[in-house]
Structures are given as C-alpha cells and as structure tokens.
From Swiss-Prot:
This is Crinkler effector protein 63. It is found in: Secreted; Host nucleus, Host nucleoplasm. Pfam families: Crinkler. The lineage of its organism: Eukaryota, Sar, Stramenopiles, Oomycota, Peronosporales. The gene is CRN63. Residues 1-17 form the signal peptide.
Length: 450
C-alpha cells in the first residue's frame, strides 16, 4: 500500500492523503481522489489529469516549498504550471509503473513519504464544486476581471506552453505577422557531416514493459547531445548551451505599444558562456543566438509555441535570433523574423530532416557577426541547405503602426459601471453575471445561444 499526498491545482486547501495499492492503476487513483472530494470535484473521475509533483532535481515537492504553499492558497506557482503542462500520468499504468519510470522508488531512495506533495490534480474548467456562494462569486468576479482587461483595456496574455492553434493565430493576427515556408536543399551525397539522431532513452519497468522517458526526464541527456554536435563552434565563439525550462519565466515581455504580454520560457538557449560561469547572468540573455524547443513528438500545433517564444526573445534582445522546434531526430524546424512586406511582418519557416544538416545550419548561424550594419534594417546571411541568402530583420522594425482601438460601446460602459459599483460596495454576483452574459452575447459564436 502506498500513501500519496495529493493537491488539487487552483483549489485552496490542504493536500489530502490517498491510500492505494501499488498494483492499482492511475485510473483507480483518479476514482479515489474523486471519492475523497465529492463537493469539490463534479466531473467524471476519468476527466481528471494527474501529474507527479517534483522539484527541478527530480525529488518530491516538499510541503514547505513556496510552490506547495501557493497550492494551499489556491494559487498556481510557475513551477507547478510547468509540471502540469508536462507529462501526465497514464490511466492504464499501475502506480508502481509510474514510480519506477520516474525513479521514485524505495530502491532509489525516493519512496513517497510524509511532508511531501506527490500528485497534482487538475480538474477540468467548470467542474469545480463550491462549498459556498462566496467561492462562486470569487470565480465569477475573476472572469469579469479578465473580461475587463481584454474588452476595456484591450489586454491579452499568451503563455508560450499553453498557446493553442487558435490563440497562436490570434497572436499573429494581433501583430499582423504572416508565416511563410522557405524551401531547403539537402546536401549532395558525401557532403556535410553525418550525425546520428538522438535516441530517446527507454526503461524497462517492473512488468517488463518498455517505456520511453519523457522530455522532462531526459533534459540533461539531450542538452549534452546538442553540445556534443556543436562543441567546436561553442568554444571558438565563447558560447554555451543551457537549459531554462524550469524556474524564472525568462521569455516574458510586453509587446511595445500594445496591451499584449508574452510569458514563459523554452527548453534550451545558446548564448554567451558567461552564463556558464555566472548562472544568474542568464536573466540578461547575453549574446543569445537562438532558442531550442524540444518535443519528443513534434505536432503541427507546436509551431505556435515556438513562434510565441521567438517573438518574445526577439523583442527582448538587440540582435536577430532564431528559434528551433525539434524532436532531435527527423524534425528540425527553424523560424526567424525575415522582412516586412507592405504592413505585415514576415516570419520565415524552414524544415530539415537530417540531424547532420541541421547542425551544419546551427554551426553556420553561430559564427555570424552579432549586429546588423548601422545603415540598413535588414541583413542577409548564407546558411547551408538554403538556396538563397537568409534575410533577417528585428521584429520591432517590422511591427505595424499602432492603430486606434475599436469602440465596444455598451460592453465597455457595463464593465466600467460594474467596477465603479464594486469599488464602493464590493463585488455583486448578480451584476457580474449580467455583465458576463452581455460580453458573451457580443461574441458572434456565442450570440446564437444567448
């Protein structure tokens, strides 16, 4: 029998214990969690998402860690967000399978103990029960707050790891950016260096099943793989490869002149080796050349995460940069800000299928001079696998002029009136509902149902 301390993300309250046999499945654990929280969880148990609560070094999350304390208050710490954005527990795996695959066993000295958080529980939106009318009102007021930011203030926030295809297209539309695919040319036979694809490590768990470890479990290994294949250039140009997938949201920036904020981080950065000597200097992104977003399986929707990260990094630094989305095997997708045509900024995208060719491109990119000539906005560089010179432009010089915001008429007035009343008398749940209904009716897709 294993005692696991579980915490519901976004719901204030202490962690609660669940006793479960190691041979039972994660699906059984979902049933047990729901049974313990009938007033809090109103969805089917199968709809819960479970993640292990681990620290950056792979240990269990201590209950006095700031991330755990925030959980008690119903807040979502950035470390918790990174965990729930990552690997989920598969319902078909036994608890023993999960613990073994993550090196969280007695044999490894990491068996679950007291004074730790072990499982993070994510409940689908709208499936939280409510112990009081106050909590209902808090949730509704929070939604109106978000409506106020977007409708009256025109604010939008995009979190890189959470950007969906719809949100990604909205971001590109907000900034008038178009993405264009650029053809590449493979090397002729015998040209370039041959590099083996990265081998995603597998482990054999107790029942004999072979399991591929997740990106999170292999970060050090794939960082060393990248370093090994560009080591000579790193040394020559005094650069290094560092992992920034945990900790501070280093790629957080507000788009100049617009109420748009991009937030989050990426997996790897290639930048000045000063960071290797003084890790705290990473916050200034010295000499950064490119970011690398690693996915075990690259999907079309992952483009938008890479694009969001590229836009943020480009706005944060003075020199042109590139983004790479890759599975380190047969998908190496490069993105960069290329030019401005009419009023639209153009981000170019190119795909390479062989690791050897991709690393030739990376090495050629890293030896480029750091700054553009003073007398021109656009630079051109020659890279392997590209037929034509690669154009590069800073996004700040490509963004369209800031236009006047539209008039939302009654919606603005209603939300502003709500805030005026709430500031004097406190939140009013019925008025909040009315404002929410009005905003919903103003959205074409929902107007048919209101």
């Amino acid at each position: 029998m294993v005692k696991l301390f579980c915490a519901i993300v976004g719901a204030a309250g202490s962690a609660f214990p669940v006793d479960i046999d190691a041979g039972q499945s994660a699906g059984d654990l979902k049933d047990a969690i729901k049974a313990k929280n009938p007033a809090t969880i109103t969805c089917d148990a199968k709809d819960l998402q479970l993640s292990l609560a681990k620290t950056a070094d792979g240990a269990w999350l201590p209950d006095d860690d700031q991330a755990a304390l925030d959980l008690e208050d119903g807040k979502v710490h950035e470390d918790i967000q990174a965990l729930i954005d990552g690997e989920k527990m598969k319902a078909t795996w036994t608890i023993e399978d999960v613990l073994t695959a993550n090196n969280m066993t007695k044999r490894k000295g990491r068996a679950p103990k007291s004074r730790q958080i072990h499982v993070l529980v994510v409940v689908p939106e709208g499936a939280f029960g409510s112990a009081s009318e106050t909590s209902k009102m808090d949730q509704l007021v929070e939604k109106v707050d978000k409506m106020y930011e977007q409708t009256v203030l025109g604010k939008r926030k995009y979190v890189h790891s959470e950007v969906t295809s719809t949100q990604g297209r909205q971001l590109l539309n907000d900034l008038d950016i178009r993405v264009e695919f650029v053809r590449t040319v493979p090397f002729d036979a015998g040209e370039g260096s041959s590099v083996d694809p990265y081998e995603w490590k597998r482990v054999i768990i107790e029942n004999g099943e072979e399991v591929v470890l997740t990106e999170e479990q292999q970060r050090k290994r794939y960082r060393r793989y990248v370093e090994h294949n560009i080591g000579a250039v790193l040394k020559e140009k005094q650069l290094c490869v560092i992992g920034v997938e945990r900790g501070t949201n280093i790629l957080t920036v507000k788009v100049p002149g617009r109420e748009i904020e991009l937030a989050g981080r990426t997996d790897l950065l290639i930048l000045s080796d000063l960071v290797a000597m003084r890790p705290t200097e990473v916050q200034y992104l010295p000499g950064v050349k490119m970011l690398i977003e690693v996915k075990r399986d690259v999907k079309a929707s992952n483009d938008f995460q890479a694009l969001s990260e590229l836009i943020a990094l480009d706005l944060l630094v003075d020199d042109p940069v590139m983004a790479l989305l890759t599975d380190l095997k047969g998908e190496w997708i490069f993105f960069w800000v290329a030019e401005k045509i009419n009023s639209s900024a153009r981000i170019h995208k190119a795909a390479i299928n062989k690791p050897g060719e991709a690393f030739e491109v990376i090495r050629a990119l890293l030896v480029q001079p750091p700054t553009a000539p003073a007398d021109t906005d656009t630079t051109e560089i020659k890279l392997p696998c590209f037929q034509s010179p690669v154009k590069r432009l800073k996004l700040r010089k490509a963004l369209p002029p800031i236009g006047e915001g539209g008039d939302n008429g009654g919606i603005r007035e209603s939300i502003e009136r709500y805030y005026d009343i709430a500031s004097m008398l406190g939140p009013d749940i019925e008025m909040a509902r009315a404002v929410a209904r009005q905003v919903t009716r103003s959205i074409p897709t929902f107007s048919y149902f209101s």
